[in-house]
Amino acid sequence: MTPELMIKACSFYTGHLVKTHFCTWRDIARTNENVVLAEKMNRAVTCYNFRLQKSVFHHWHSYMEDQKEKLKNILLRIQQIIYCHKLTIILTKWRNTARHKSKKKEDELILKHELQLKKWKNRLILKRAAAEESNFPERSSSEVFLVDETLKCDISLLPERAILQIFFYLSLKDVIICGQVNHAWMLMTQLNSLWNAIDFSSVKNVIPDKYIVSTLQRWRLNVLRLNFRGCLLRPKTFRSVSHCRNLQELNVSDCPTFTDESMRHISEGCPGVLCLNLSNTTITNRTMRLLPRHFHNLQNLSLAYCRRFTDKGLQYLNLGNGCHKLIYLDLSGCTQISVQGFRYIANSCTGIMHLTINDMPTLTDNCVKALVEKCSRITSLVFTGAPHISDCTFRALSACKLRKIRFEGNKRVTDASFKFIDKNYPNLSHIYMADCKGITDSSLRSLSPLKQLTVLNLANCVRIGDMGLKQFLDGPASMRIRELNLSNCVRLSDASVMKLSERCPNLNYLSLRNCEHLTAQGIGYIVNIFSLVSIDLSGTDISNEGLNVLSRHKKLKELSVSECYRITDDGIQAFCKSSLILEHLDVSYCSQLSDMIIKALAIYCINLTSLSIAGCPKITDSAMEMLSAKCHYLHILDISGCVLLTDQILEDLQIGCKQLRILKMQYCTNISKKAAQRMSSKVQQQEYNTNDPPRWFGYDREGNPVTELDNITSSKGALELTVKKSTYSSEDQAA
């Protein structure tokens, strides 16, 4: 073999080997790409499947979560339904039990009422039988048992303090009667402390002068307070007062026989007098000269309606030691006093704190300016019946620290006066601005910052509306307000009452008389004033529904719904059932009411002290018999216009209502004059006549409704009566 062939063979072999290995390498690379691609495809398929599974699982998971939430809500709802069902069962049982107990209690009250009424009638029968037996025949065994079962109580065994407290509740006439029972009772009525204060005005028509003189002579060292108001006494009797050396208070108002000479004797013998009431007497300048000479410690002086003294008499007050300790002064009705007279008062009585000047049309701004120049301590001011007082008076009073102010029936007082009040009298607690037509909502806005205000009387201020009251209640004054009189403020509506329930937590007395826009919704807001004890809704549109809502209050003691023609017996009965503590009720001029309301009062409201059913012609003797049998604490009763009542009710009242003090029975055509005269000796004040009821009552002397033609003039008369009755608030009347 040649080298060339070897080289050629080697080259061929090498080429073949390279070709073989290259093809093999190429095939291997292709195989690797397919494997990688297959792996990638597998991974892609796996990833795709995972993402698909993840998406499906997410939807499934969301679905399952929703199902779980729905199931949870369903279970909660089922639990709530079961709980509400249990509550419903419990409340149903409680309601049935409460109704059963209420029904049982009501039945017990009715049964007790019937038993007491039966006992009352038996007592009346025995009493009348005893009155008819003039020879006092032997009693039956039952009557003897009734008498003998009475428990004996000897009050003379009580401590002296307790005995005094018992006798303090009695009038002078009752004390004298008690002293005539026996020797032990006479000794109890001779306690010295019992004769510190003697009120002869309550027995002015009973006790003659000689007994008054002997009483004063016997107790001359113990007497501290004497009241002769309205007594028609001889001058000698007044002179006996001078023996009471320790006398501190003397009231001789309305005594026509009291003269300057009587005053001279008293002033010489009683130098320690602190309070002196000379109102409506015939005193002159001579008495005025005696006051500073003898009464050096005089603090309270009333010269109301004494028109015989002059400015010169007021000048005498500065003589000697003067009346510089005078704190209270009443000059009501003294129209003879001029501006100079008020200057004399300012010079003599610089310490005056309480000033009352009523019924004085001659009072002007200059009079007040002259007075307050030196009397800067005035805190209480009363000007009623002074039409010439204007805003200038408030400007002049800016130097005084007023706490109580009262104006009434003044047309010259405007909103400007209240701007002075806001700036100068931050401590005002009582504001009476009744029947001041110039007052608007702006005035209430000025009063809102008064933090000490407790009493606000804006009766007959017809220009006041919801907006003004809202602005007032939004201020700090609403938090302490205790009494609010908005009678005849006809622009007020339910919005004002809603604001009252939100902002007045301490409101006790509220008058919304003749607020005609008040509805049942407003009555619902009144229930939310939890501190309320007295409400006047007379002349409003209240119905039985409103009374049912009002009965939920539970704490009302006084309710007035006079001239409310939509209420019936059912409404009053529903209210009485829930108002067991009711003390005052006025349903006068609600002619649709009958005996049923009196029965409800006798059953549920036995603590009643004041009742007015004037203008209710359907009330009969049987109703008053029930009232007398149950309501033994009745003090004030107005049955004027109850034309069906007879003399029988007066006998019942004398037996059952022994605490009756004021009785009004005008237009009672079936009550005789003789019976009324007998009754007058049992009460302190009585009004009686047998005239036919006025036409605006709406019925005749037999209780039959009058025709529309006869009732044309009724609205005017009723309005005048309503305006007159609604002027004063409860606290003002008490004062």
Curated annotation (Swiss-Prot):
Q: Where are the LRR repeats?
A: 230-254, 255-280, 281-305, 306-333, 334-359, 360-385, 386-406, 410-435, 436-460, 461-488, 489-514, 515-538, 539-563, 564-589, 590-615, 616-641, 642-667
Annotated spans, Disordered: 682-703
- Cellular localization per UniProt: Cytoplasm, Cytoskeleton, Flagellum axoneme; Cytoplasm, Cytoskeleton, Microtubule organizing center, Centrosome
The main location is cytoplasm
Where on the tree of life does the source sit, at the highest rank? Answer: Eukaryota
Q: Which residues form the F-box domain?
A: 152-198
- In this chain, composition skew of type Polar residues spans 682-692
| Coiled-coil annotated spans | none
GO-annotated cellular components: centrosome; cytosol; motile cilium; SCF ubiquitin ligase complex
Which keywords fit this entry according to its UniProt record?
A: Cell projection, Cilium, Cytoplasm, Cytoskeleton, Flagellum, Leucine-rich repeat, Repeat, Ubl conjugation pathway
Q: Name one GO biological process term.
A: SCF-dependent proteasomal ubiquitin-dependent protein catabolic process
**Protein's UniProt keywords contain Cytoplasm:** yes
* PROSITE patterns per UniProt: FBOX
Cross-referenced InterPro entries: F-box-like_dom_sf, F-box_dom, Leu-rich_rpt, Leu-rich_rpt_Cys-con_subtyp, LRR_dom_sf
PANTHER family reported for this sequence: PARTNER OF PAIRED, ISOFORM B-RELATED (PTHR13318)
The family assignment reads: Belongs to the DRC6 family.
- What does this protein's UniProt record list under function? Substrate-recognition component of the SCF (SKP1-CUL1-F-box protein)-type E3 ubiquitin ligase complex. Component of the nexin-dynein regulatory complex (N-DRC), a key regulator of ciliary/flagellar motility which maintains the alignment and integrity of the distal axoneme and regulates microtubule sliding in motile axonemes. Specifically targets CEP192 isoform 3 for ubiquitin-mediated proteolysis and thereby acts as a regulator of microtubule nucleation activity.
Q: How does it assemble?
A: Component of the nexin-dynein regulatory complex (N-DRC). Directly interacts with SKP1 and CUL1. Interacts with TCTE1/DRC5.
Query: Could you tell me what this protein is called?
Result: F-box and leucine-rich repeat protein 13
Gene it is expressed from: FBXL13
